[in-house]
């Protein structure tokens, strides 16, 4: 039980009227790290601990287990890069231009294929968005990032193509995000699946446009983990990645 505490006694405190809307926190968008949708793999710690299920989703910051299928309103897109070593994340480039350890990405050897072994540095497609069927407080969805890399790169290109060919804004559509199990000689893992669910309603479009103006180019995404994307060890005989 929570112990009963004494009331705070400050002159004039009883006359103060609390604001209806939150006060200015003094934080700019650059001070905020956007939570990320984690796709749980069979090797993920949260799966082995019984918290989540393989192929499921989780909020990377709060640990909230998310629905099996996500309805997302994407409001922008940007690319980043990440390289993992034996001890975890080794180098990170939030903008895909310059890494935190190895300098300019365009001059980095870790971007190249070597003897059919894929690049050690992975390209990440980031989609800041709102989950419309989860993570809602007081009727307002909270922003989060959907990140796709490695074996989900094909899905990212499909999503990018769908939006580019529609000649519409990211926030004009609501997409359904799910996962699919893949088995091959490299193991068992899950990849993202995406399809357009419907056109966004006017209030959703306004929310997406507002978020685009507020956040685009002014945010960092919570760090990826190596389990977020399955990394094939080498190309197949045909020279292609066995996705």
At which residue positions do the language-model features occur?
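Intrinsic-disorder/low-complexity, polar/charged segments
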Residues: 43, 95-96, 145, 149, ...
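Short glycine-rich, low-complexity/disordered patches
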Residues: 86, 91, 121, 173-178, ...
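Extended serine/threonine-enriched, polar tracts that run as long, contiguous segments within proteins
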Residues: 123-199
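Long, highly charged low-complexity segments enriched in Glu/Asp and Lys/Arg with interspersed Ser/Thr
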Residues: 75, 84, 185-243
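OB-fold ssDNA-binding interfaces and closely related basic DNA-contact patches used
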Residues: 1-139, 184-185, 197, 240-243
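Detector for methionine-enriched segments
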Residues: 39, 58, 89-92, 148-149, ...
């Amino acid at each position: 039980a929570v112990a009963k505490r004494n009331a705070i006694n400050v002159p004039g405190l009883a006359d103060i009227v609390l604001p209806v809307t939150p006060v200015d926190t003094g934080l700019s968008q650059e001070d905020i790290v956007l939570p990320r949708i984690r796709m749980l793999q069979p090797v993920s710690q949260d799966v082995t601990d019984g918290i989540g299920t393989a192929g499921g989703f989780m909020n990377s910051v709060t640990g909230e287990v998310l629905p099996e299928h996500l309805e997302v309103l994407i409001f922008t897109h940007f690319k980043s890069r990440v390289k993992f070593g034996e001890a975890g994340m080794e180098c990170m480039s939030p903008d895909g231009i310059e890494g935190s350890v190895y300098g300019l990405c365009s001059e980095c050897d870790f971007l190249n294929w070597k003897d059919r072994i894929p690049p050690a540095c992975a390209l990440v497609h980031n989609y800041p968005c709102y989950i419309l069927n989860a993570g809602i407080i007081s009727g307002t969805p909270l922003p989060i990032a959907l990140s796709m890399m490695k074996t989900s790169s094909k899905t990212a290109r499909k999503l990018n193509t769908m939006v580019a060919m529609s000649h519409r804004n990211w926030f004009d559509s609501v997409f359904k995000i799910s996962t699919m199990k893949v088995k091959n000689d490299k193991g068992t893992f899950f990849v993202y699946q995406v399809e357009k669910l419907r056109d966004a309603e006017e209030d959703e479009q306004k929310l997406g446009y507002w978020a685009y103006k507020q956040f685009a180019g002014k945010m960092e995404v919570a760090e990826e983990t190596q389990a977020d994307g399955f990394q094939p060890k080498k190309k197949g005989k045909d020279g292609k990645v066995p996705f």
